Amino acid sequence: MGTPVNITLGSHVWVEDPELAWISGEVTEIKGTNAKIVTANGKTVVASISSIYPKDTEAPPAGVDDMTKLAYLHEPGVLHNLDCRFALNEIYTYTGNILIAVNPFQRLPHLYSVHMMEQYKGAAFGELSPHLFAVADTSYRAMINEARSQSILVSGESGAGKTETTKMLMRYLAFMGGRSDTEGRSVEQQVLESNPVLEAFGNAKTVKNNNSSRFGKFVEIQFDKRGKISGAAIRTYLLERSRVCQVSDPERNYHCFYMLCAAPPEEAKKFKVGDPRTFHYLNQTNCYEVSNVDDAREYLETRNAMDIVGIGQEAQDAIFRVVAAILHLGNVNFIKGEEADSSKLRDDKSRYHLQTAAELLMCNEKMMEDSLCKRVIVTPDGNITKPLDPESAASNRDALAKTVYSRLFDWIVDKINSSIGQDPDAKSLIGVLDIYGFESFKINSFEQLCINLTNEKLQQHFNQHVFKMEQEEYTREEINWSYVEFVDNQDVLDLIEKKPGGIIALLDEACMFPKSTHETFAQKMYQTYKGHKRFSKPKLAQTAFTVNHYAGDVTYSAEQFLDKNKDYVVAEHQALLDASKCSFVANLFPPLPEDASKQSKFSSIGTRFKQQLQALMETLNTTEPHYIRCVKPNAVLKPGIFENDNVLNQLRCGGVLEAIRISCAGYPTKRAFDEFLDRFVMLATDVPEGSDEKSACASICNKMGLKGYQIGKTKIFLRAGQMAELDARRTEVLAGATKLIQRQIRTYLTRKEFLGQKRATIYMQKLWRAKLARKLYQNMRREAASICIQKNIRAHRARKNYTKLQASATVIQTGLRTMSARNKHRHRRRTKAAIIIQREWRRHQVHEAYKKHKKATLALQCLWRAKVARKELKNLRMAARETGALKEAKDKLEKRVEELTWRLELEKNQKADLEDAKAQEIAKLQNNLTELQEKLDEAYAAIIRDKEAAKLAIEQAPPIIKEVPVVDNTQLELLNSQNNELEVEVAKLKGKIKEFEVKCFALENDSRASVTEAEDAKSKAVEFQEIIERLHTNLSNLESENQVLRQQALAASTSVEEIGELNSLKDKVAILESENETLRRQTESAEKTMPPARVFASEKNLENEHQTKEIQATKEPRNPINVLAKQGSLTDRQQESHEVLMKCLTDERRFDNEKSVAAWIVYKALLQWRLFEAEKTNIFDRIVHKIRSSIEGQDDTRELAYWLTTSSTLLYLLQSTLKFSNTNNAASRRNRSSHATLFGRLVQGMQPSSVGLETSSGYSGMAGIPNDQQMVEAKYPALLFKQHLAAYVEKTYGMIRDKLKKEINPLLNLCIHAPRPTRAKTLRDVTKSIHLTTIAKQQASYVQWQNIVNKLEHTLTFMAENHVPSMITRKLFHQVFSYINVQLFNSLLLRRECCSVSNGEYLKMGLHELEQWCLKADDEATRSPWDELQHIRQAVMFLVSHQKTQKSLDEIAKEICPVLSIPQVYRIGTMFWDDKYGTQGLSPEVINQMRKLMTEDSANMTYPSFLLDVDSSIPFSVEDVSQSFHGGNISLSDVDPSPLLRQRSDFHFLFQTLPE
C-alpha cells in the first residue's frame, strides 16, 4: 500500500488497532526499527516503523472530496477521510473518477430532488460536490459528445445500497433523456416500474440486507440521435435457485411468496394460500416479516407495477398461480413404498397439497405423482421405469420447484423486455450494472463461487481501467512510465474458468458421471491444483477448498456443487408441464426440438453462467466504464455508525484499495507546481531568482535527494513515500524555524523587560523630584494664605460696624415713609365716594325720562294696529262673497272623478279583450314558426343540392357570371320597416310623455286639497306601468320575428356564389339587432325619467297609439336595397379605419407625458366605435396577432419593453372601463366556459375595478373616473381580448426576465469562485507576489461583477426609456436578484473549494458592487431587490466571520444566519475551510447539535433540502397592473395623436375637447 518512510520524533502517524483497524498517534520514542507511539485514546503502543503510516496533520477536518488529493494515499488515510465525511452526512466521495457511496441508512431526499438534478445537469465532473448524478451526467455527456456507449458499474456487498443507487441512476438518465408526458407512457417509466416487479421475484431478506438482490442485473438504456431514450433491455444473471427450497435462519425466501400469503382474502382463497408458517419452503426459518414492510401493500403495488410494464391481468393470475403451486409442492412429503427403493405420498395432507399443486398448474394429478416418485430411463431396448426412494423423490420435487421458479423468473424478464421494446436503430446506450458484491460467509457454496468469479472478472476490468487512466495521465503529462507495473488477477480467473483444467470444467466433468460425488470432486481438485499459489486445502477438510481472491481467502464447501451445477429438466417434468391445460404454464416448458432431444450434450449452470459473464464482459469492453462502489458502514443497518473494520474489508472487496495499490505502483502523489511550492517553498531558499515553477520543484526534489520522481507539464509526480520524506524535511525546517523564532521572541521579551525596568527607574526618580518641588511650593502657598486671611479678618470687622449703623438709619426712614403713605390713602377714599354718589344720581334722572318716552310710543302703536285690522276685516268680508264660485269648482271635480271611474271600467274590459287577442296571436305565431322551421330545413337541403349542382356545372361548363337575385327582399323590407316604425313610435312616445308631464303637473296642482284623488292618481300610475311592460312584451315579440326573418333570409340563398352575399346580410341583420337593442335602452331610459305620479292621465291614448303603430308596421314594407348599399359603404369605411388603427399601433412608437400613445389611440378608437359591445369583430384578433408577431422570437430588450408597456397600458384601460355583460347570448356563454380553464386566474380581474381613469369612458367624450353608469358592458370578444392582453403581458415579462437571467448566468458561474492567484516562484518573491496578487485579484474581480452590473443597468435603462410601470420593473429585479441569490448560494453549497475565507471575501466584494449599484440607482425598483440576496449575504458573512469555534448554535442561527435553515448552516459549516489564516470552523458541539436537529426532522418526515428553488412564476396579477397605473397621473386628455390621424375625419373624436 505504501513504502515505509523515515519517522522522526513528534511525527503524527497511523498505527494498527485491533478494535478500530487504524488509530492516530504521536511518536514519542524511536529505538532501532521500533517506535513508541501514544495513541489518540491515551494508550502507548510499540510498533515497527515499517507497519506505520504518516498522518497528514494539515488535512481538512471535513475530509477531501477526491481522495487522490490526499497527501498520503494509504489505507488509514482513505478510511479516515471516509469516516470524517460520513460523520457530516457526506456519503459520496471520489477516488479519481471512481465514486464511493456510503449507505447512510436514513432518508436524505434533498440529495435526489429534481432541483439537485438541475444543478448537476451539464456540470463538469468534479466541479460540484461528489454525487452519483455527476457520474450519470458524465456518462450521458460522453455518450452524446463522443458517440460512444457508456456503462456504469455499481457494486458492493448486500445492504450497501446498490439497488437504490441503481434506481437513482436510472431516474437521472430518465430525467436527462426522458420524453414529454404528451408522448404517452415512456420507456423510462416502464424501466423504472420494472424494479418493483423484479425485486418481488428476485429479492429476499438476508442476514445483511432486508432487500437483497439474489440475481445480477444489467440494464441497457438505448438513446436515439437526439439523446432521448428510445429503448431498453434488462439482462439478468444467476438467479439463486436454491433459495426456493432451502432458507437458513434468520433469512427469508423470495418476497413474492410472502406477498401472496398476505394478499386480500379473495385472492388468497383463489390461490389457496394462507399463513406462511404452514408451508415447508417458508417455515424453515423463524423470520416471516420484515420491519417497516407491509407485504399486503407490497402485493398490491407489485400488481400495479405489472400493469405498467405490460403484464396483463390474466398473465398476473397465472404467475401467482404458479407461485402458489410451488408453495403447495413443497408440502408434498414421501415415505417408503411397498417395493424396494420406492416411495409414495406420506399421508392425506401430502395428497391434498399434490392435488392443489396439480390444480393450480392445470396438469394431471396422477402424472405429477408419477413424475415425482418414478424416473424413466431410456435404453436402446426400450424405456425402463425406475422407482425413486423417498430422499430422491424429495430431491426430485425440489428440482421441479426450482426449475419452475427459474423459468417463471426468466419469463417475467423476457416479458418486461418485450413490453419495453428495444430500438434497433439506437446510436448508443448506457448500461447500468447492479451486480452482487464479493461474498464470504461461514459456509460458501456454488453460488458464492460464481459470484466471486464475476467480481474477479469485474475487478480485472476495473484494474485495467484504473491503470489505463493512470497511463493516460502519464502520457498527457509526458513522463516516462514504461516501468510501471500492476498486479493482475488472471491466474485466479484461469483457476476457476479455464477450459480445460479449471474448477468449473472439473465440476462439469464430475456432473456427467452418475457415480460422482462431492468427495470425488473435491479429491480431483486437490490432485489437480496441488501447489497452485491461489488454491489451498484447509486442514482436516474432506470436501472444502480455499481460493485466494483479490479480496482475500474464501473457503468453499463442495458438498452441493454437483446438484447446483446441473441445468437440465427431467423429461417427466417436461412432459407433465408441457401437457398443462394452462397455456401460460405450457409456454414455460415448450417442447424441445426433435434433434435437440436426441442430443446427449451436457448442460450446466456453471457453463451457462460463464457464457453470460463472457457476453457481459464483451459488452462492457465496448463501452466506456464508470464505477460506483457502494459501502455498508455497519452491520446493524443503523444511521450514524461507522465500523472501521467492516468498511475496510468492503474497500478491499470492492477493489478500491486495489486501485490505490495500482496508483501506488506508479506515482500515487500528483501535485500541481503551485500547490507543491505552496507546501514546500521553505525548502527552496537557495533557488536562483527568476527560476520558473518547474525548475523550482526540480531543485527542491534534487536538494532533498529524491530518486525516481517525474516532472510533468503541469504536475510533479512522486513515488510512494517521497511525500512523507518531503514532509519530514519540511517538519525539520519548520522545527528549526520554530526554534529560531522562539529564540528571537525570548530575546525580544528579555530586552523588553530590561527596557521596562529602565523606564520604571527613570519614572520613579521623576516622581521623587516632583514630590520635593510640590512640598516647597506648598510652604510658599501657606505663607501667602496667612497674609490673605489677616487681610480678610480686618475687612470683616470694618464691614460689620458699617452694617449696624446702616440698619439703624433704615428703621427711622421706614417709619416716616409709612406715616406719609397712610395720609395719602385716606384722601383717595373720600374722593372716590363722592364720585360714586354723583354718578348714581345722574343715572336716576335719565331712567325716569326713558320711561315716559316708552309709554307714549306704545299708545301710538296701538292706534296704528287697530287701523290695519279694520282694513283686513273689510277684505275678508269681500272674500266671503266668492263662496258660491268654490262650490261650483267642487261640483266639477266630482264629475271628473266619475268620468275617471268610467274610464277605468272601460279599460278593464279592453284589457280582457287584448288578452284573448294575445292568446290567439301567440297560437298563430307558433304555427308560423313551425312552418318557417320546415321551410328553413327545406332551404338548407336545397342549398346542399344546389352546391352539388354548382360544382358539377363548374366542372362541365365555362364560368358564367350571373346576377345574384335577392330571394326574400320582402321580408328584409318588412324588417327594416318595423325598425323604422319603432323609431317613430319611440319619438311619439317621448312627445306624449312630455304632454303627460304637463297635464299631470296641472292636475296635481288642482288635486292637492283632495287626498282621495291623490291615491287614485297613484293607482293609475301603477296601471300605466303595467301598460309600459306590455309595450316591452310587444317589442320582444318584434325582436323574435326579426330573428326568424334573419334565419329565413339566410336560408333563401340557393347557389354557391351567394355565400358572400349571405355573410354580408348576416352583418346587416346584426346591425339591425344592435339598433333594436339601442331602441330598447332608450325606451327603458324614457321610462325611468317619467315620474310615476304623472302618467295616468293619457294611458289609454298611449296604448291605442301603440297598437296603431303595430298595425301600420305590418302594412308598410320598405325597400332594403338602399339601406344595404349604405351599410356596405359604411363597412368599407370601418375596414379602412381599422387598417389605419393597426398602422398606428405599429408606427406610433412614442410616449407623451410617459404614456403610450399607441395604447391610448387604440383604446379611444375601440371605445368610440363601440367595439367592446359588439358580438363579433375581428379587430381584437388583429391587435393580438400584431402583439404576438412583434414579441415572438424577439431578442431585443428595448423592443420587448415597449410592447410590455403598450400591452399593460391597454390592459389597464380595459380593466378600468369594461364590466361583465349579463345579457350575452348562449353561444357567448358557451365560448366563455370553454376558455375558463385557460384564463381562470385572469377572470377574477374582469370585475369593474375601483381604480379611476381620467379619460373618456362614454361615447360623448366625457372625462373622469367611470362610475357604474359609465362602465361599458363588454361582450365576449372584448372579454377574450382582455384575457389575451393579460397573457401577453405575462409572456413579455417572462421573456425579458429569462433573457436577463440567460445573460448573467455564465457570469455568475465565473463570480462564484475567486480567481486563483499566481504563486510565488521563490521564497524571496513572496512579498512582491502577494502585492501583485492582491492587485490582480481586485482587477479580475471587478470585471465579472461589473459585467453583471452593466447587464442590470442596461435592462433598467430600457425599462425606463419605455416607461414600463414601476411595479413591473420592481418585480422583475426582485426575481432577477432572487435568481442571483439562488445560483450563488447553491453553487457555494455544492463546491467545497468555494467555502473558504478568501472566497468569502471575494464574494463580499462582489456583493458590495451590487449593493452600490442598488443604492446609486434613482429608480426605487432597484433598491428593495437588495433584500432578495439575504441567503448569499448571510452565507458570506458566515465565511468571513472570525472565531467560529467560539460561537454557539443560537448565536449563529439568530445573529449571523437568521434566514438560513439548519441543514443550510450545517452544510456550509461542514464544508468551510480557512485557506487564509488556518483557523478551524465550527466546534464539534455545534455540529452535533445541528446533526441532532436534522435527525429529528428526518424522523418527522420534514427534512428540507439545503438548496434553494428558482421562482419562475409571474409575480403580479391584473389588479396589480391596475394599481401600478393608479399610483400616477393617468389622464389621457393631454396626449397628442400623430399628424396621420389629424388628416382623417373618422379619427376627429381624438381631438374633441373634453368638458370641464
Swiss-Prot record:
It comes from the Eukaryota. Residues 883-1091 form a coiled coil. One of its GO terms (biological process) is actin filament-based movement. SUPFAM superfamilies: P-loop containing nucleoside triphosphate hydrolases. Keywords: Actin-binding, ATP-binding, Calmodulin-binding, Coiled coil, Motor protein, Myosin, Nucleotide-binding, Repeat. Gene3D superfamilies: 1.10.10.820, 1.20.5.190, 1.20.58.530, 6.20.240.20, Kinesin motor domain, Myosin VI head, motor domain, U50 subdomain. Residues 62-731 form the Myosin motor domain. Residues 1181-1496 form the Dilute domain. InterPro entries: Dilute_dom (IPR002710), IQ_motif_EF-hand-BS (IPR000048), Kinesin_motor_dom_sf (IPR036961), Myosin_head_motor_dom-like (IPR001609), Myosin_N (IPR004009), MyosinXI_CBD (IPR037975), MYSc_Myo11 (IPR036018), P-loop_NTPase (IPR027417). Preferentially expressed in stems. Residues 734-763, 757-786, 782-811, 805-834, 830-859, 853-882 form the IQ domain. SMART domains: DIL (SM01132), IQ (SM00015), MYSc (SM00242). Residues 495-529, 531-554, 589-613, 613-635 are annotated as: Actin-binding. GO terms for molecular function: actin binding; ATP binding; calmodulin binding; cytoskeletal motor activity. ATP binds at residues 156-163, 209-217. GO terms for cellular component: unconventional myosin complex. Disruption phenotype: The double mutant xif xik exhibits aberrantly enhanced organ bending, including increased gravitropic root bending. The xif xik abcb19 triple mutant has a stronger bending phenotype than the double mutant xif xik. Belongs to the TRAFAC class myosin-kinesin ATPase superfamily. Myosin family. Plant myosin class XI subfamily. PANTHER family: MYOSIN, MYOSIN-12. Homodimer. IQ domain mediates interaction with calmodulin. This is Myosin-12. It comes from Arabidopsis thaliana.
